[in-house]
């Protein structure tokens, strides 16, 4: 039970009849925590292959935005009736509508997202393995993790790391919490600290958002982004009308839309010296009162789609399209294709032209659009 509570701490917030059978779920649905053997190396044979479009004029630069608690159903890019993505709608992005998460909590999803194993095998593993970021570094890329959340859950243990709460920038931070835009305020300075010889080959930056972390949704957005009012301003969601909870949550999506547009804007400024691209995907979703459920953390087998279906957005600069020969038009034509976090490891390696025996082309969702 203690293991359950560590992995599903969000459950204590649930306003949900399922709480009464919570102990039963512990016995019947959730596997016991498995013993982990020693760390296993992965992708030691990784190297940079020639990109499909040839030798790059400028090194590739990928920003991987790791979203927090964003659900696909609340993105207007995916058909939500409220305009929560006004800025991304103006960019040449692809928003994938049918993406399944590895889990229903950050602790469960995040390590799985960076693993080569996929959700089913990750849950069964008997050893820990190096991850996507290790393989990228084995190939020679510079890698940076910028964290505006509760840490990287061990995924950046061997990667240069910046915790934004340590930056003490008052224009972005109050106490230990900062707006996600603080990462853009510091990214240039932090990139300059990475080894120059690696940056000359290419760079991958992970930006881990505060995003839509609840239940205090109202704390995630500045006043100018409170588009939907009145919003719930209580961390006990039962004290608010459901409409107020939804307003507060939707405002966090509006701010994420702004942040992602700012990331794209920053990447465009790098085109003189880099070949930029962005990949955004959330770790898990969120319940907002559907069937009287709130927040997240239900065991996967009984979790509703609001907790398991997450937004994923890609942006490729014209230079990156030419380099990778991956067409945004083709990606947009496949936006409703069922995908999952299982695709991330292989898709990022494929996009960055990493050749390794652990890469599986059939799991690379970019591969289907190469040369099309």
Which ranges hold each PLM region?
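Catalytic domains that recognize anionic headgroups
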Residues: 1-372
């Amino acid at each position: 039970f203690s293991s359950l509570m560590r992995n599903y701490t969000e459950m204590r917030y649930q306003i949900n009849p399922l709480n009464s059978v919570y102990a039963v779920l512990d016995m019947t649905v959730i596997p016991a925590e498995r013993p982990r053997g020693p760390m296993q190396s992965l992708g030691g044979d990784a190297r940079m292959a020639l990109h499909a479009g040839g030798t790059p004029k400028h090194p590739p630069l990928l920003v991987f935005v790791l979203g927090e608690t964003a659900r696909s159903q609340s993105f207007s890019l995916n058909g939500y009736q409220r305009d929560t993505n006004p800025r991304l709608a103006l960019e040449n992005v692809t928003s994938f509508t049918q993406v399944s998460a590895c889990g229903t909590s950050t602790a469960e999803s995040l390590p799985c997202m960076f693993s080569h194993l996929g959700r089913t095998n990750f849950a069964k593993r008997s050893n820990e393995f190096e991850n996507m970021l290790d393989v990228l570094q084995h190939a020679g890329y510079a890698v940076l993790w910028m964290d505006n959340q509760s840490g990287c859950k061990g995924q950046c243990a061997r990667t240069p790391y910046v915790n934004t709460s340590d930056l003490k920038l008052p224009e972005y931070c109050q106490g230990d919490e900062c707006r996600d835009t603080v990462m853009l305020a510091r990214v240039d300075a932090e990139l300059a600290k990475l080894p120059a010889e690696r940056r000359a080959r290419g760079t991958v930056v992970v930006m881990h958002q505060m995003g839509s972390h609840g239940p205090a949704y109202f704390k995630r957005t500045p006043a100018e982004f409170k588009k939907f009012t009145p919003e719930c301003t209580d961390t006990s969601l039962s004290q608010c009308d459901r409409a107020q909870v939804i307003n507060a949550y939707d405002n966090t999506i509006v701010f994420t839309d702004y942040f992602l547009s700012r990331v794209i804007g920053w990447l465009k400024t790098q085109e003189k010296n880099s070949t930029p691209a962005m990949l955004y995907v959330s770790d898990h979703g969120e319940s907002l009162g559907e069937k009287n459920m709130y927040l997240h953390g239900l065991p996967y087998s009984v979790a509703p789609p609001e907790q398991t279906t997450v937004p994923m957005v890609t942006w490729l600069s014209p230079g990156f399209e030419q380099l990778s020969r991956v067409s945004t038009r083709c990606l947009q034509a496949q936006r409703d294709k069922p995908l999952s976090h299982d695709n991330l490891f292989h898709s990022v390696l494929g996009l960055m032209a990493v050749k390794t025996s652990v890469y599986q082309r059939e799991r690379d969702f970019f591969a289907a659009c190469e040369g099309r």
